[in-house]
């Protein structure tokens, strides 16, 4: 039988994702064959992994990192349903790694009934291969208006009960206040058949001495029969990307060196895979700013256009903010401009998407014209995780010459160059990156996560993901009840 540990939260952004990641690493270093699972994730941050049939598919970045923390190979069973928001009320539905246009068009209640059994398939395959499943919930498990369709929290818990011993912990962000009420209310609203799974409350992001909470934890246990399993200290920079595409608007300056480079990453409404830029925040002397206005681009050295889930929509937003003129002026004055995937497509001459595969129906929509590219969108999405090879880029990018780097591609547009030097190729030799003067566009994601690139461009060594996993695992082992942790993990 497979053991399951469920990480529920009282709210979104309570700390479920990073806590599940830390628990995966604790399990791994105790010798437990563990795997992460989230039945449904909503995020435009995705990674390319293997599907059960051997092909390539997408999962949310959180489960990708959790798998790395558990020291297992990520696959689509770990996040069988991924919702990628396209507008305020619509999302692309990705099932076992592949976008399903028919499901994307369905009302969510009808869709959920079809998705739940598909998600369970992933859980059961994982349970057959692993001794422990660390399940991450979504939002709160006590949204009683959603309970009939909630296969992410409640359905997963019932699948876990059927698979073997199961327990749940409930994490709450105490820094926001109201955690005692949140925990009690969530416990009270849980379905009767699942309330008994809850074996511990966890207060996250606490400032100061946990004794200041007394007698709150004791009174909460008296009312619920559930102990407070731990109080985790506030840690702003835990080294992992935030779940759900959340990011901090505050600019950061990498410690250990004086200011030497200002980098602005644009933050349009449909930004995707923003987590790939997190390592820049740790480069000594690099000032990183998420930018939504022209004022935030004043005095920067680099302007980065990131990936986008809706390229034409984000291009329209960029123009509405007057950022197109700022980017053009920056490039004309010799400033560096980098476009990644959708950002690269915006830098080109035109976008052609008459069937609306990327969101809006557009025919030869003018791009920014800084690269001689024409992008045509089609129904087939390119999903690929493989090394890429730089040729001989020049100017600000010359340090990248000859580098072979791990990368991944998630895109439905094909870009063709009229001119400009192809400076990046995939492992088959196909061009996937072009440069014109100081403007560089690449189809590949994940380049800034490569230590080799950070050394080449900045002469910097930043803490690795594995270091972040170990640090978080240390914190969890220090602050969670040791006996409960041993019982939950089985080791």
Task: Describe these PLM feature segments.
Residues 341:
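Catalytic nucleophile serine of serine hydrolases
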Residues 2-329, 336, 379, 394-491:
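Flexible phosphate-sensing "switch/lid" loops adjacent to ATP/NTP-binding sites
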Residues 348-403:
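A conserved active-site-flanking secondary-structure segment within enzyme catalytic domains
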Residues 330-333, 349:
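Active-site C-terminal subdomain of aminotransferase-like
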């Amino acid at each position: 039988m497979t053991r399951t540990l469920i990480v529920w939260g009282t709210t979104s952004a309570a700390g479920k994702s990073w806590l599940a990641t830390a628990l995966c690493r604790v399990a791994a270093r105790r010798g437990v064959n563990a795997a992460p699972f989230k039945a449904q994730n909503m995020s435009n941050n995705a990674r390319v992994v293997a599907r059960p049939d051997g092909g390539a598919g997408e999962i949310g970045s959180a489960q990708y990192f959790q798998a790395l923390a558990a020291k297992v190979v990520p696959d689509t069973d770990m996040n069988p349903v991924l919702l990628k928001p396209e507008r305020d009320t619509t999302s692309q539905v990705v099932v076992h790694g592949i976008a399903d246009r028919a499901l994307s068009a369905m009302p969510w209640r009808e869709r959920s009934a079809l998705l739940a059994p598909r998600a369970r398939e992933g859980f059961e395959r994982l349970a057959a291969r692993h001794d422990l499943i660390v399940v991450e919930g979504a939002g709160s498990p006590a949204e009683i208006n959603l309970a009939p369709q909630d296969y992410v929290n409640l359905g997963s818990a019932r699948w876990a009960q059927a698979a073997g011993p199961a327990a749940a912990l409930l994490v709450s962000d105490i820094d926001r206040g109201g955690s005692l009420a949140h925990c009690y209310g969530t416990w009270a609203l849980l379905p009767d058949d699942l309330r008994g799974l809850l074996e511990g409350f966890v207060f996250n992001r606490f400032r100061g001495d946990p004794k200041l909470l007394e007698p709150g934890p004791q009174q909460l246990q008296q009312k619920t029969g559930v102990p407070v399993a731990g109080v985790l200290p506030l840690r702003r920079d835990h080294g992992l990307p935030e779940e759900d595409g959340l990011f901090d608007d505050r600019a950061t300056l990498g410690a250990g060196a004086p200011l030497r480079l200002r980098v602005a990453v644009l933050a349009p409404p449909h930004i995707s895979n923003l987590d790939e830029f997190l390592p820049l925040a740790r480069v000594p002397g690099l000032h990183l700013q998420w930018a939504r206005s022209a004022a935030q681009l004043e005095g920067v050295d680099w302007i980065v256009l990131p990936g986008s889930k809706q390229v034409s929509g984000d291009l329209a937003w960029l123009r509405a903010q007057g950022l197109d003129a700022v980017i053009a002026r920056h490039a004309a004055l010799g400033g560096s401009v980098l476009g990644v995937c959708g950002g690269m497509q915006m830098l080109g001459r035109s976008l052609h998407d008459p069937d609306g595969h990327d969101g809006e129906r557009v025919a030869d929509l003018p791009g920014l014209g800084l690269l001689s590219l024409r992008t045509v969108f089609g129904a087939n999405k390119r999903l690929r995780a493989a090394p890429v090879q730089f040729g001989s880029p020049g100017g600000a990018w010359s340090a990248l010459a000859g580098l072979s780097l791990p990368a991944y591609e998630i895109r439905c547009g094909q870009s063709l160059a009229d001119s400009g030097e192809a400076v990046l190729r995939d492992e088959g030799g196909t061009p996937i990156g072009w440069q014109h003067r100081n403007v560089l566009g690449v189809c590949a994601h994940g380049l800034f996560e490569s230590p080799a690139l950070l050394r080449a461009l900045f002469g910097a060594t930043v803490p690795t993901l594995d270091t972040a996993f170990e640090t978080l695992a240390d914190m969890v082992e220090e602050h969670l009840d040791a006996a409960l942790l041993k019982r939950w993990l089985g080791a």
